[in-house]
Amino acid sequence: MSRINKNVVLALLTLTSSAFLLFQLYYYKHYLSTRNGAGLSKSKGSRIGFDSTQWRAVKKFIMLTSNQNVPVFLIDPLILELINKNFEQVKNTSQGSISQCTFFCVPRDFTAFALQYHLWKNEEGWFRIAENMGFQCLKIESKDPRLDGIDSLSGTEIPLHYICKLAAHAIHLVVFHERSSNYLWHGHLRLKEHIDRKFVPFRKLQFGRYPGAFDRPELQQVTVDGLEVLIPKDPMHFVEEVPHSRFIECRYKEARAFFQQYLDDNTVEAMAFRKSAKELLQLAAKTLNKLGVPFWLSSGTCLGWYRQCNIIPYSKDVDLGIFIQDYKSDIILAFQDAGLPLKHKFGKVEDSLELSFQGKDDVKLDIFFFYEETDHMWNGGTQAKTGKKFKYLFPKFTLCWTEFVDMKVHVPCETLEYIEANYGKTWKIPVKTWDWKRSPPNVQPNGIWPISEWDEVIQLY
């Protein structure tokens, strides 16, 4: 009996072991081999990356905007730069012909798109449909700065930004608004008190830290990772604009207060000068932009913008600043070709260069070239009859965009420091008598030109 029991037990153990072995073989063949095969197939390029959170969010967003006829275009600097580097590949790719996600699957927290607000016909309906599709959306609004000069309309609110989150990825929709002279503007993304600061990592947003101004881009449609999107026709021009896009508004409230204290000059002569000065500024901007030379409003023209949002009627000229490293040898010829003859040339490229051109109606264009030192910047001046040199010192500054007399132009971002350097703490008080050699608080003597150089550094026409 004992022997039989041992044989039975042995047989049962053998049978059980065999069954378990067969199960392992079956499991390996039908499960593990399938998984490994799928992984191998994926690694060989059969639709790699199209299950990524980023691509799925972008695809759903494009479906939403396409179905609702919302004309968005891609402005994400990272993706645009990648597209630009691989543009031949993108240009020759048709929808559905790709096997690998190259652009939209790049790890990141946001993808930035934009639209021009005047082309958006169904804003509220779009917002509701987006949430029905699974997006969690946040809308940022603020007062329309274009109406700040009009008391009765200055409280009107406009949409500035949408952030729509799907799973772990968010779409940042930047709303561009038209401004004068055909450029686009977006507002500051300022979070109100009730907004959840943990909704998305706001600090990683590439647009909205401050208002921005951009040239209106020409758009083209391309297929990127199997998705049809609009992008700027010159992607790198847009990308290069981003870090230099900061925009500051004219101070309309302070300008109104200024004119309550000091009545505006609306005489025929003042109106005529402002008209001529505006036309001269437009012509100068067109000429310098064509040359690719950046400039900013300087001296009295900058003071007029900052203090009264207008041209100072008794200034009698237009003042611009240019960094000396941006000087081009064909500047003089370009202005002459534009109908502005050279009135005088002082200094030289290496030291204290200054150009003056004669506009119509006796309005003069003065261009001051700025030189950078370790802890300050300066521009020079020259007295023609004596050869004396002067230097005007400014704290270091960067450039921002603004709007002035219906134009998009640069001004120093650190405007108050710039104005106070040139005009002192009493810059709010109009001064009609001004001695360029003594009045500015930042002027100092800078030697005298050797007589042997006068023919080069003092040229009057």
Swiss-Prot record:
Sorted UniProt keywords: Cytoplasm, Glycoprotein, Golgi apparatus, Membrane, Nucleus, Signal-anchor, Transferase, Transmembrane, Transmembrane helix
Glycosylated position list: 92
Region (Required and sufficient for interaction with POMGNT1): 6-27
Gene Ontology terms: biological process: protein O-linked glycosylation; protein O-linked mannosylation
Record bears the keyword Phosphoprotein: no
Annotated transmembrane regions: 8-28
Top-level EC class as recorded in UniProt: transferase
Location within or outside the cell: Golgi apparatus membrane; Cytoplasm; Nucleus
Pfam families: FKTN_N, LicD
Catalyzed reactions per annotation: 3-O-[beta-D-GalNAc-(1->3)-beta-D-GlcNAc-(1->4)-(O-6-P-alpha-D-Man)]-Thr-[protein] + CDP-L-ribitol = 3-O-[Rib-ol-P-3-beta-D-GalNAc-(1->3)-beta-D-GlcNAc-(1->4)-(O-6-P-alpha-D-Man)]-Thr-[protein] + CMP + H(+)
EC number(s) on file: 2.7.8.-
Tissue: Expressed in the retina (at protein level).
Gene Ontology MF, one: phosphotransferase activity, for other substituted phosphate groups
Keyword DNA-binding: no
Protein function: Catalyzes the transfer of CDP-ribitol to the distal N-acetylgalactosamine of the phosphorylated O-mannosyl trisaccharide (N-acetylgalactosamine-beta-3-N-acetylglucosamine-beta-4-(phosphate-6-)mannose), a carbohydrate structure present in alpha-dystroglycan (DAG1). This constitutes the first step in the formation of the ribitol 5-phosphate tandem repeat which links the phosphorylated O-mannosyl trisaccharide to the ligand binding moiety composed of repeats of 3-xylosyl-alpha-1,3-glucuronic acid-beta-1.
Family: Belongs to the LicD transferase family.
Protein name, per record: Ribitol-5-phosphate transferase FKTN
Organism name: Macaca fascicularis (Crab-eating macaque)
The organism's taxonomic lineage, starting at the top: Eukaryota, Metazoa, Chordata, Craniata, Vertebrata
Name of the encoding gene: FKTN
